Amino acid sequence: MYDVIMIGGGLHGGFAAWHLLRREPGLKIALIEQDSSYSHAASARSSAGVRVLFSQEENLRMSQYGHEVYGNFGDLMALDGQPQPLTFWRQGYMFMANTPEQAEDMATNHVLQTGMGAEVNLLDASALKKLLPSFRADDVLLACHSPKDGWLDPYGALTSLRRKNQALGAEYIDGVVTEFEQSSGKVTGVVLQDGQTLKTEWVVNATGAWGGEISKMMGFEIPVVPLPRTQFYFECREEVEPFGLTIDGRGCSVRPEGKGYITGRTHFERAG
């Protein structure tokens, strides 16, 4: 019998378990992960951006807290007194506006962001050209730049978090959830593909883009669907000035990766 079962052993499920175990040591927690190597996991394959460039206060506060955690990650994940360092590239984050509507929203968001203490700068086309002379930005009306944001090593974060949770008593289980046992509208058990049933008091849906599918298995729907994202790695023949994770008004992103860069776009028109 478990106190809590996390469906998903990536960063979302892992951090949920870590917070619970810090608050209440001794909880019996299991994390069910269908890809324990994380070779196909969204957490490991993401661009791993960490930013304060949000339009909702709740998201911004969570991101500010995330900065605290990742900024002290090594000490927070220490095992036997030994820090578990995490690489965090604080090279900045930028959104570009290509339409008047995007520029207006960006200016409105800037008021919220700076009002909550975030370091965010608005750049017009001239200032943007000075900062990124290698970028073609003649169709950019406005940009917002957060110099203290960036990206981290997602696989390093995953493995360190997993080891820390296991040291705190959490159990990671390889498996695929196929259904839930329920009684009086409450989930009481999680059934896995191999046939075993795990009894629990609470279930946390931490499956990210697949959260909608898991919720349907519980008997209700949430507006969460997976979106395909295409990413490519490339290198430049000529040297480019240092820059952070950058996203234009069409949703195309680019950031440094090793000796080159990764670029990609989410296909919103292919939801599901």
What are these regions (language model features)?
Residues 12, 37, 210:
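Conserved Rossmann-like nucleotide-cofactor binding loop
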Residues 101, 132-140, 181-188, 239:
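A short, glycine/Asx- and small/polar-enriched loop/turn
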Residues 34, 125, 177:
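Active-site loop/turn elements of alpha/beta-hydrolase fold enzymes
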Residues 48-131, 251-253:
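Dinucleotide-binding Rossmann-like beta1-alpha1 core, especially the glycine-rich loop
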Residues 144-202, 206, 210:
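Helical element adjacent to the flavin cofactor pocket in flavoenzyme catalytic cores
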Residues 18-24, 34, 43, 50, ...:
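Active-site substrate-recognition segment that forms the wall
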Residues 2-30:
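N-terminal Rossmann-like FAD-binding beta1-loop-alpha1 element of flavoenzymes
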